[in-house]
Amino acid sequence: MTRTITPSITDDDALIEATLRPRALDDYVGQEKAKGNLRIFIDAARGRDEALDHVLLYGPPGLGKTTLANIIACEMGVNIKSTSGPVIERPGDLAAILTNLEAHDVLFIDEIHRLSHVVEEILYPAMEDFQLDIIIGQGPSARTIKLDLPKFTLVGATTRAGLLSSPLRDRFGVISRLEFYTDEELAFIITRSARILGMEIKTDGAAEMARRSRGTPRIANRLLRRVRDFAQVKADGVITMKVVQDALALLEIDEMGFDQMDRMILLTIIDKFGGGPVGLDTIAAAISEESDTIEDVYEPFLIQNGFLNRTPRGRVATKAAYLHFGRIVPEPPQGKLF
């Protein structure tokens, strides 16, 4: 199922994000704590003419990890080489990337938690000592030589920090968690994006769109493009609150930002499993979706906003979920006295 509000990046997102992406920390909206810390670390590194310490960015998808990696390179005045964990299959792949870096360059690895153990072993000395261990020959005659690397900055991004091995995580000097955005921050981002794309948007239209964007800039920008299409064909081209409401009604995105899949998850727990607790794999089987996708993509927003609880016994729909769908909230079971 194709989701308009999935925080995962799509081909359309990749094409347009380059246009909308800020290039400097001062232009980056939100994430004030992470941004403030990075400003200090970047200014200090530039003042000493050193490479920035390695940076780990983690949090739900669509919150700006890739954007921050590019901003770090721009602020440091260096080049950035971007790749992802699944692409680096063999140690030789990583060695080829590392040996092509220049002094102080940024190496950005998205989905860094998906690096294989063998590749990680090559990365440890590269991060810590800026050396690459290369094995020449095979068997008893094999020997290891150390190749010096330029001092570089590794920026790793992950949605699942818990899957990182401790040795890898401990080698990052800067670790920042990105949080969901406020409606006010998203409205500012939407207004800025509309201006860049040459759209006219009213304040109430931006606020309504922000409210339904699930705290995620990537979703906000995607909704903006879909509402722009609606405004062009069904209205006078100006994005107002009424235009946003009508457009998102057609896309089946409700006032909380829920789409069909969110409703399916919560209603399955409520209607089929008595509100829970129910195991993740059981939910996945009931709605024909992958367990990892539910856990990484759908659940964070539902949990953050109090519609779902994750317990040791399984997932439980909250009172807010029952009320949102007009269901009667069940009475808590009465404990036995004897």
From Swiss-Prot:
A GO molecular function assigned to this protein is:
four-way junction helicase activity
Gene Ontology CC annotation, any one: cytoplasm
Identify the stretch(es) annotated as Head domain (RuvB-H): 255-338
Specify the domain of life of the species encoding this protein: Bacteria
Instruction: Locate the residues binding ATP.
Output: L20, R21, G62, K65, T66, T67, E128, D129, F130, R171, Y181, R218
**Subcellular localization:** Cytoplasm
**Domain observations:** Has 3 domains, the large (RuvB-L) and small ATPase (RuvB-S) domains and the C-terminal head (RuvB-H) domain. The head domain binds DNA, while the ATPase domains jointly bind ATP, ADP or are empty depending on the state of the subunit in the translocation cycle. During a single DNA translocation step the structure of each domain remains the same, but their relative positions change.
As for what it does, the entry says: The RuvA-RuvB-RuvC complex processes Holliday junction (HJ) DNA during genetic recombination and DNA repair, while the RuvA-RuvB complex plays an important role in the rescue of blocked DNA replication forks via replication fork reversal (RFR). RuvA specifically binds to HJ cruciform DNA, conferring on it an open structure. The RuvB hexamer acts as an ATP-dependent pump, pulling dsDNA into and through the RuvAB complex. RuvB forms 2 homohexamers on either side of HJ DNA bound by 1 or 2 RuvA tetramers; 4 subunits per hexamer contact DNA at a time.
Task: Write the protein's name.
Answer: Holliday junction branch migration complex subunit RuvB
Q: Which organism is it from?
A: Geotalea uraniireducens (strain Rf4)
Lineage start: Bacteria, Pseudomonadati, Thermodesulfobacteriota, Desulfuromonadia, Geobacterales
